[in-house]
Structures are given as C-alpha cells and as structure tokens.
Design a protein with these regions (language model features):
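Conserved oxyanion/phosphate-binding beta-strand-loop segments in alpha/beta enzyme cores
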Residues: 2-8
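Generic secretory/membrane-interface signal
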Residues: 4, 66-68, 108, 134
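Active-site nucleotide-donor binding segment shared across nucleotidyl transfer reactions
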Residues: 40-73, 82
Length: 146
C-alpha cells in the first residue's frame, strides 16, 4: 500500500480548516514544539537517542509538521534511556517545565511520562484531569524494549 503525498495546497486546506494560525490548537502546537526542543536539548546533552512516534511521526511525514488536529507530541526511546531521562527530568530545576509521572504525582495513572509546562492550561474538560497536579498540553515520552 502506498501513501499518497499531500500537495502543498491540500496541506494548507487542512491547516486552514482544522488549525488556522492563532487558534488555540495552533498555539498549543507551537508550545509543544518549544517543549520538544527543550527535551531534544536535554537528550543531546546526555547522549540519549529518541525518535518521533505515533501521530507525531505521521504528521512529520505526511504534513511536514503536525497533523492539523493533533494536540500532543509523542516520542519514544529505549527503556534504559527512558529510565535515565526520567531521573534527569525528575531532578530538573526548572520554573517552566515538569516531568509528569507516577513518581511526581500519585494521581497520574499513565504508564508513560509527560513533559509539561508547570502552568499549563486545560483545553478539554475531563474528570481524569481534575486530580492531576499539572495539566495542559504535554509531550508524551514512551519506552520500548530493544
């Protein structure tokens, strides 16, 4: 099965329909890019290899950026590197960012970690977020076995 490449006009139509410049979603995506840059810098400093994953990888390949309606970033790394990064991020002295996981928030139930802004805002109301210590957009970090 071959994937049809979208033309620039098709990409722009999708962006305009689902995600115009200045929209809340587009602003969140720009915030996520800054967060990805921060994590990429930390990984580079500590020789941690990572890859784009899931919808983020699909968006990069198909849309040359985000899938227009995507509201998170997904990365993956080997489990041993995830454990190292988790230690680093849990000890990160940052006023801006936090690593959200079970160790930093007893109410957090996901099996993966989220790199978040400390002062993030919630766009989607959900009871599961009511108990979270930190909210808002996040960069999902997954671990895989070799």
């Amino acid at each position: 099965m071959t994937q049809k490449r979208l033309t620039e006009a098709e990409k722009e139509q999708l962006r305009a329909k689902y995600n115009p410049e200045g929209s809340l979603l587009r602003n969140d995506q720009m915030e996520l890019l800054a967060m990805l840059d921060a994590v990429a810098d930390i990984c580079k400093q500590h020789n941690i290899e990572w890859w784009l994953s899931s919808g983020t990888l699909l968006g990069a390949a198909r849309h040359d950026g985000f899938i227009p309606w995507d509201d998170d970033v997904d990365i993956v790394m080997l489990k041993r590197d995830y454990k190292r990064l988790k230690r680093i991020l849990l000890n990160l002295d940052s006023e801006e960012f936090v690593f959200h996981c079970a160790e930093s928030d007893v109410e957090y139930v996901n099996t993966f970690g989220k790199f978040r802004k400390r002062q993030g805002r919630v766009r989607v109301a959900s009871r599961r977020y009511d108990y979270y210590r930190w909210r808002g957009v996040g960069l999902d970090i997954f671990a895989i076995e070799r």
